[in-house]
């Protein structure tokens, strides 16, 4: 078994041991920081520590559910566990007028995206933003972007057994090489692999589509870069820009 830090908590919930990792706590804290810095959130009402506490409680419940449905033992957080945490944000944050116009869930997803991007930029190599995603792009992200440019896609879910989830991530060349230096258990490296994909999405290099409990990543087409801004979520779709 891999070593675990003192801050990393084992939580016994019934017969399903779960692990709330340092990186998942850090990401939730970054979401709280993004909320405290956001002009869309009413700062006069304060951003309570209960936001992070509530998010961790919801995360633990989601991990427990996955342990019971998949039989995985123990269960670790994934980035695709974040959508079920939206109630922790929408129910605890008060929006200013502009935030209310966009909708609490849209604002909450933006805060999550900001936190993911900050963690991505802090842990992984700098992304060459001005170079198009093509086979000649230099750097560690070239194999990943080239693979997606060939028409491939990845679909992940918080309901997948870990073996299936890890196998889906392993299809993407270059992903494991980026995540491996961060160490930890295989489940933790898979978390970092997924964070790379979402970091590339937040950096406008990949498209992401949400549907029910699944998250899909695919090539970002040029026409997707020039879509007009929307005031709120599009009805009937989980697409996130």
Kindly give the residue locations of the regions a language model identified:
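Conserved AAA+ ATPase small/helical "lid" subdomain
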Residues: 2-76
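C-terminal engagement/docking regions of AAA+ P-loop ATPases
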Residues: 44, 64-241
């Amino acid at each position: 078994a891999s070593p675990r830090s003192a801050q990393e908590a084992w939580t016994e919930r019934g017969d399903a041991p779960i692990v709330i990792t340092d990186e998942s706590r850090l990401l939730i804290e970054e979401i709280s920081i993004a909320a405290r810095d956001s002009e869309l959130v009413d700062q006069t009402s304060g951003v309570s520590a209960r936001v992070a506490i509530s998010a961790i409680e919801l995360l633990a419940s989601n991990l427990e559910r996955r342990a019971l449905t998949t039989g995985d033992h123990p269960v670790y957080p994934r980035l695709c566990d974040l959508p079920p945490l939206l109630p922790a944000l929408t129910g605890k944050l008060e929006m200013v007028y502009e935030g209310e116009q966009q909708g609490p869930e849209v604002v909450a997803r933006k805060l999550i995206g900001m936190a993911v991007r900050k963690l991505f930029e802090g842990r992984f190599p700098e992304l060459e933003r001005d170079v198009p995603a093509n086979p000649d792009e230099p750097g560690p992200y070239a194999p990943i972007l080239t693979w997606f440019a060939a028409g491939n896609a990845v679909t992940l879910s918080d309901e997948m057994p870990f073996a299936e989830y890890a196998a889906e991530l392993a299809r993407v060349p270059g992903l494991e090489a980026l995540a491996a230096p961060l160490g930890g258990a295989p489940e933790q490296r898979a978390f970092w692999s997924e964070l790379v994909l979402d970091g590339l999405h937040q950096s406008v290099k990949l498209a992401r589509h949400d549907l029910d409990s699944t998250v899909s990543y695919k090539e970002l087409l040029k026409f997707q870069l020039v879509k007009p801004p929307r005031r709120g979520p599009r009805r009937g779709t989980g697409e996130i820009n």
